[in-house]
């Protein structure tokens, strides 16, 4: 069975701005029915490399974090370190990159936790059910420790 996909165009008008559209989209998709009360909620997104613009802006993350907090949840933004050398190869550089691109508790309304730790080795190996080529996946511990996982993604 195919998954439902919800879409909102990026046109804003005097009656509804983009953050209001995102809130309506989350409600329409059923996120308002999730029990967030006292739950740690991982909001996974890409913070972007320094100087790069291919990432969702912090105000989008703020909208999701506020939605979760209004329902009693404890949101945090997260991503894992990269395997390649760049601005996200370890947690310290990753946090600097996030801040340079505008992600911080003041702009997003929640903390940032790099899911796989300082050097990218804080992980949990989980089996991939029915995996033909990949039998196990290494998942960042903070993601595995979260009670709820929300993926806030972009496409190019």
Regions found by a protein language model. Name each.
Residues 1-156:
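N-terminal and secondary-structure boundary signal
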């Amino acid at each position: 069975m195919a998954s439902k996909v919800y879409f909102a165009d990026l046109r804003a008008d005097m009656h509804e701005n983009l953050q209001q559209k995102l809130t309506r989209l989350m409600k329409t998709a059923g996120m308002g029915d999730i029990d967030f009360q006292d739950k740690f909620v991982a909001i996974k997104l890409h913070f972007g490399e320094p100087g790069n613009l291919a990432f969702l802006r912090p105000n989008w993350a703020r909208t999701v974090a506020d939605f979760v907090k209004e329902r009693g949840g404890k949101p945090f933004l997260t991503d894992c370190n990269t395997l390649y050398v760049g601005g996200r190869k370890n947690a310290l550089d990753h946090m600097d990159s996030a801040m340079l691109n505008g992600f911080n508790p003041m702009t997003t309304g929640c903390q940032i936790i790099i899911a796989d730790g300082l050097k990218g080795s804080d992980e949990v190996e989980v089996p991939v059910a029915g995996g033909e080529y990949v039998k196990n996946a290494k998942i960042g511990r903070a993601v595995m420790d979260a009670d709820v996982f929300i993926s806030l993604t972009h496409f190019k």
